[in-house]
């Protein structure tokens, strides 16, 4: 948990007055930490309490800096009636985004649907190294979310994967997240996606459609 002290320096009559304000959010998080120190609390309960604290922060904090990137959003339902979460890899710049806020926004976006079956569509199109967070952050996210996030995730579609993406997904799902290994599906073309979801509902950015035509020809394009 992070603790924040905000120092407000005011200058008057040549003297410096320091006003120290304790962030109420940090006080609440500190209380959770104190409760988790109790030996009687089992690991599952501790994890749930930490996540509940994270969920509270996700609802209360200002996350517009992440929301404005539009890198993750809900996009209706697939053809089996499952909620769809869209992740645009190119719009996620880990060097320019607060990763703690990114996690909070992910939780705010995804948590309302995880009690039912849902799928994720990840567009790897035209990404660079700056769009790919560290393995340790991905592991942190996976270990932070609750069981429902993993159990009710029915498919994770990677659109326009590279060889590196395939190898990374295989390694992570084999050694760190075997519960989702069989849920990862690589899709080389948007036509592969059309059998699963209504593409019009996904709000696919134009650059993805353009790149798909470069990679796969004009078979996708429908004027």
Residue ranges and their predicted role:
Residues 2-223:
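Basic, amphipathic alpha-helical/coil surface patches used to engage anionic, phosphate-bearing ligands
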